Amino acid sequence: FVDESEKKLLLKCYKFNCRSCGSNELKRVVSLGYQPLANNLLNKKNEKCELYPLEVNYCIKCHNCQLSVAVDPKKMFTNYLYTSSTSKVFRNHFVDAAKKYLKEFKLNKKKSYIIDIGSNDGVALKPFLDLGFKKILGIEPAKNLAKLANKNKIKTFNGFLEKKNIKKIKKNADLILASNVFAH
């Protein structure tokens, strides 16, 4: 049972139709109950936090699988606690990827413009910086992570990649990265 405020919250973010085809023929196939948002740690033992159903629905019409609830991205990413650079495996992966992209796409260290969408703390852009690239830009909605990336000399715009922010990107990119955006 949920109280009235939880009911309003759920109705606001619950997806009754398939995001691919629009059908309302969705069947719940996995339910992990009510969960807090990832990485949202409480400060006090009795502090209340919002819980969301963590469920996967299957569309009978087009076979798409989707989460039943889409939490407002601003709520999820305003202050995001996970920093990608804490993973040595992740750091090494992006070093290897940068070297591969440099060679495969014949990128020019002085002229090529590289953008990373959902750049977190700049983990995917740092290897390009270390290789001598001058024109890089991270786009990161979490204010704390954008600030951290900028502090580490990785130019990062704090915001979502949406129409109103597109004009802030000064030119066409030669390489666009979006390593972790689909995980959310």
Positions of PLM-derived features:
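Conserved SAM-binding loop
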Residues: 99-184
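A short linear-motif detector with a strong N-terminal bias
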Residues: 5-8, 35-38, 46, 93-95, ...
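N-terminal juxtadomain amphipathic helix
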Residues: 3-89
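Class I SAM-binding transferase module
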Residues: 1-11, 15, 36, 40-42, ...
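Fe-S ferredoxin-like electron-transfer domains
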Residues: 54-131
